[in-house]
Amino acid sequence: SNILLLGPTGSGKTLLAQTVAICLDVPFAICDCTTLTQAGYVGEDIESIIAKLLQDANYNVEKAQQGIVFLDEVDKIGAVPGIHQLRDVGGEGVQQGMLKMLEGTLVTIPERNSRKMRGEPIVVDTTNILFIASGAFNGLDRIVNRRKNEKYLGFGAQSSESQGRRAATAADVADNYSTADSSLLEDMIEKDQLLNAVESRDLIEFGMIPEFVGRFPVVVPFHNLTENMLVQILTEPQNALIPQFQKLFSMDNVELTFEPKALRRIAKVAMERKTGARGLRAILVN
């Protein structure tokens, strides 16, 4: 079953998908959904996704048909209210173009770079390809909160003043600048709890079309990384940042050490900036 990963930036969505592909020893391709457009428009078309997977499989069609495709930033192709669907070539149009590929179809790829195929078109069956979609879905927690607390007036008219994705995202961005340090942890916990309650209708209200949502039966919410988690990321993995910087300094005969409170301060700054693990390197460099 295809999987939808949703959660804050820097929480490990891409790394998890890459690790799964390595453990299974299957081809893996990452597609940035923000570059996709409907067929006939400037930009990457839907077939380019499978072309990347085929390239990673060294043009072995059978191997590519068992691979994993990671659709990054899938929330950015949500339909935007006020734009006609026929003109939304980078949003709803892309979602519609992906439907057949997600459920399983034959995709013809015009060969360009492989000497093995001698210019012949390649046909790939997507039935057994695992598609993992990922996105931050900023504002989705507010849509869930509104659904859980909605009130009705008259014959079922919603009293909520917010309208879908645009208003929810705007409110979420405003919160990023108004959250006080003392309530940062409480705010993170509340958002995590709301993401745990996400339903298909919330994703549809966000801007994803029902047919697209239905092709991702498994929805996995990712939570904000805590201070302790960020400290572990700094120090424990094989390619952790702290050992990297210590090795770099040792080349100049400098011994670099970090006190525990310094590591916690770095983690706290990353939490305040809401950049997750991705922002740790920038904090250390600066």
Language-model features: locations:
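AAA+ P-loop NTPase nucleotide-binding core of proteostasis motors
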Residues: 1-29, 33-42, 46-55, 59-286
